[in-house]
Amino acid sequence: MIGFTLGTGVGGVIAIDGHIYQGRDGTGGEMGHQTLDPEGPTCGCGNRGCLEAYARADRIAEACGTKSVEEAIERARAGDPRARAGLERVGRYLGVGIANMITTITPQRVVLGGGVAASADLLLDTIRDEVRRHVFTTSLEGVEIVTAELGTWAGAIGAAIHGAERADAAGAAARQGRTPAVPA
């Protein structure tokens, strides 16, 4: 499973057999910082063209000509052409980022959570179209792209579970007299 948390940034998680993949140094899952365009806008991380530079909340508002992502969603639902075009553009970038991850990992499910996921009714068709455009058909078989059942709380709950797993691993290691192999 791959999860994207869409809000003030673009967070991510990779879960394999029910466990969060952490990578070598605990940073596995930084999908928001995959480069989509090396000449693109500067991201908060200093890189250029990251998915997050296109799909974080303030950039969505900017693309839609609004002060907030909530206003952008409201206007798009009311039929505002600029807001609809801005969200469609964001959906295309999200679709490309998700396609990259599907091509790399071939998960069974991609879950979209966070505040921006509240606009899923405006984004999902575009995201799915982009994914189909950029992923081999065989890699797409059986892949679901869905919104998080936990909605805007998905990222916070996932972080809490991750923290609990790390604490449990550290406690088990300490009970065995070992230093935990979990990044700080």
Predicted regions and their residues:
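A short acidic/small-residue loop/turn micro-motif
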Residues: 27-30
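Short glycine-rich anion-binding loops that position phosphate/pyrophosphate groups of nucleotides
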Residues: 7-9, 116-117
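Short glycine-aspartate micro-motif
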Residues: 1-5, 11-13, 42-44
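ATP-binding/phosphotransfer module of carbohydrate and carboxylate kinases, centering on a glycine-rich
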Residues: 15, 20, 35-184
